[in-house]
């Protein structure tokens, strides 16, 4: 069976409740269609759960896209003056991300040991841009939002 969900936004308890509703077996696949992170308090918990389950296929959402360059900068241990050392583009990326709910993700990410931070970043980097399935002779595209400049 193939399942899909999206826009979990750090809501681990709601995610776990949904997972209890899905009889996800070893031969089943769950596509998570983006926006796992931000807004809610438990983005890292959800990402770790997904990492531990190879039949969960993550698709990149706009929140992961905003988070990724910032999280890469947060992998090393932070030093005094961290913000002053950032380029103006990096500061702008952080500002945009925090305005879109990234603060909870940053706080949670910084509590992780450096090695776990690195693993989280590598995992998000592995997110697909889309999935494509053929079911009953129908072709289905699994994406977060839309395909820009798409034409048949």
What is each residue range found by the language model?
Residues 1-49:
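N-terminal active-site segment of His-dependent metallophosphoesterases
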Residues 7, 105, 144:
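A residue-level signal for conserved active-site and pocket-lining positions in enzyme catalytic cores
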Residues 74-76, 145-152:
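Short, surface-exposed, charged loop/turn segments at secondary-structure junctions
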Residues 9-10, 64-65, 146-150:
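Short, solvent-exposed loop/turn segments at secondary-structure junctions
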Residues 136-138, 143-147:
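Short, well-ordered beta-to-alpha junction loops that form the rim of enzyme active sites
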Residues 4, 32, 58-59, 141:
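Residue-level marker for buried hydrophobic side chains located in beta-strands
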Residues 10-12, 133, 144:
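Catalytic core of the metallo-beta-lactamase
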Residues 43-47, 52-132, 138:
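Active-site neighborhood of divalent metal-dependent phosphoester bond hydrolases
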């Amino acid at each position: 069976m193939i399942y899909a969900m999206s826009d979990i936004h750090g809501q681990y308890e709601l995610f776990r409740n949904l997972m209890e509703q899905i009889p996800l077996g070893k031969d089943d696949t769950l596509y998570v269609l983006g926006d796992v992170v931000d807004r809610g308090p438990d983005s890292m918990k959800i990402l770790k759960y997904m990492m531990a389950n190879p039949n969960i296929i993550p698709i990149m959402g706009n929140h992961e896209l905003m988070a990724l360059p910032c999280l890469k900068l947060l992998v090393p241990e932070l030093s005094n003056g961290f913000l002053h050392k950032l380029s103006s583009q990096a500061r702008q990326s952080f500002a945009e991300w925090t305005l879109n709910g990234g603060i909870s993700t940053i706080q949670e990410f910084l509590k992780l040991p450096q090695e776990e931070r690195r693993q989280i970043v590598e995992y998000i980097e592995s997110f697909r841009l889309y999935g494509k399935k053929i079911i009953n002779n129908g072709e289905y595209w699994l994406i977060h939002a839309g395909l820009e400049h798409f034409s048949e």
